[in-house]
């Protein structure tokens, strides 16, 4: 396969380069990644300003390009310009740090995969614990085996897989749902040399989801979580409830009385 790799940690990130080296043993690899860290950029794209792209000689086994854009930009340019739309799969990662629960809203890594799904190719976001001695080689071989054996045709269009690795040895993988995992934010006021006040944000993880099939629960038990996510944010159940209100007698009465 021709696989496009990106990330949000930057083009020299260990997780990205090790994954690229492992996958290059069986696949054609194109790396297009931000020249510097783009963590927590979400699904931002660059408009009304240039996106610079340059080939870098980080590794010689396959082409690697650094851009001034976001992960979503990298996927767009990689697929539509550098690869002339000849890409079979997009993989974003391996990210340094998990992307669980509501992390996916903020994650540049996840958004890189969702951009691939939006462009119509099988796409994966891959994240790992943020620790120095994490075994990226083992994780990369897991991903290599996974993409060879998983039937991506079973997924609905515009769906990506969000994959997270556990801290220790891998017991296997489990299909999971996105958890209710939020942050209790803290803001520390600081002063710059000119006397201006700025803020430094911290966040304490709040994991209050009791379901055993949620992503962080599975990861905490030593399994790889595989969560299907979509580019669409529609709440189907709420839409049905809203339609009931729209078609209800009370709504029609209120509308007529206000006309």
From Swiss-Prot:
<dbReference type="InterPro" id="IPR036523">
    <property type="entry name" value="SurE-like_sf"/>
</dbReference>
<dbReference type="GO" id="GO:0008254">
    <property type="term" value="F:3'-nucleotidase activity"/>
</dbReference>
<keyword id="KW-0547">Nucleotide-binding</keyword>
<comment type="function">
    <text>Nucleotidase that shows phosphatase activity on nucleoside 5'-monophosphates.</text>
</comment>
<keyword id="KW-0963">Cytoplasm</keyword>
<dbReference type="InterPro" id="IPR002828">
    <property type="entry name" value="SurE-like_Pase/nucleotidase"/>
</dbReference>
<dbReference type="GO" id="GO:0000166">
    <property type="term" value="F:nucleotide binding"/>
</dbReference>
<feature type="binding site">
    <location>
        <position position="95"/>
    </location>
    <ligand>
        <name>a divalent metal cation</name>
    </ligand>
</feature>
<dbReference type="InterPro" id="IPR030048">
    <property type="entry name" value="SurE"/>
</dbReference>
<dbReference type="GO" id="GO:0008253">
    <property type="term" value="F:5'-nucleotidase activity"/>
</dbReference>
<protein>
    <recommendedName>
        <fullName>5'-nucleotidase SurE</fullName>
        <ecNumber>3.1.3.5</ecNumber>
    </recommendedName>
</protein>
<dbReference type="GO" id="GO:0005737">
    <property type="term" value="C:cytoplasm"/>
</dbReference>
<keyword id="KW-0378">Hydrolase</keyword>
<dbReference type="GO" id="GO:0004309">
    <property type="term" value="F:exopolyphosphatase activity"/>
</dbReference>
<dbReference type="GO" id="GO:0046872">
    <property type="term" value="F:metal ion binding"/>
</dbReference>
<comment type="similarity">
    <text>Belongs to the SurE nucleotidase family.</text>
</comment>
<keyword id="KW-0479">Metal-binding</keyword>
<feature type="binding site">
    <location>
        <position position="8"/>
    </location>
    <ligand>
        <name>a divalent metal cation</name>
    </ligand>
</feature>
<feature type="binding site">
    <location>
        <position position="9"/>
    </location>
    <ligand>
        <name>a divalent metal cation</name>
    </ligand>
</feature>
<feature type="binding site">
    <location>
        <position position="39"/>
    </location>
    <ligand>
        <name>a divalent metal cation</name>
    </ligand>
</feature>
<dbReference type="Pfam" id="PF01975">
    <property type="entry name" value="SurE"/>
</dbReference>
């Amino acid at each position: 396969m021709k696989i496009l790799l990106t990330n949000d940690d930057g083009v020299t990130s260990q997780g990205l380069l090790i994954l690229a080296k492992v996958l290059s043993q069986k696949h054609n690899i194109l790396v297009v990644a931000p020249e510097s860290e783009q963590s927590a950029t979400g699904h931002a794209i660059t408009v009304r300003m240039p996106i610079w792209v340059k080939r870098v000689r980080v590794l010689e086994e396959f082409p690697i390009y650094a851009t001034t854009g976001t992960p979503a930009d990298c996927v767009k340019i990689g697929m539509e310009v550098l690869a002339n739309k000849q890409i079979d799969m997009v993989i974003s990662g391996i990210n340094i740090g998990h992307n669980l629960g509501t992390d996916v809203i903020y994650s540049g890594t996840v958004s890189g995969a969702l951009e691939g799904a939006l462009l119509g190719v099988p796409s994966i976001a891959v994240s790992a614990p943020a620790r120095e001695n994490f075994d990226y080689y083992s994780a990369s071989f897991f991903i290599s085996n996974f993409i060879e054996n998983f039937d991506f045709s079973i997924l609905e269009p515009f769906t990506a897989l969000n994959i997270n690795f556990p801290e220790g040895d891998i017991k296997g993988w489990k299909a999971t749902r996105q958890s209710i995992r939020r942050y209790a934010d803290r803001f520390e006021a600081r002063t710059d040399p000119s006397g201006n006040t700025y803020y430094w944000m911290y966040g304490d993880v709040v994991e209050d989801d009791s379901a055993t099939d949620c992503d962080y629960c599975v990861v905490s038990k030593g399994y790889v979580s595989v969560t299907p996510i979509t580019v669409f944010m529609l709440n189907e159940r709420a839409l049905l409830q809203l339609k009931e209100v729209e078609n209800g007698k009370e709504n029609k009465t209120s509308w007529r009385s206000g006309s």
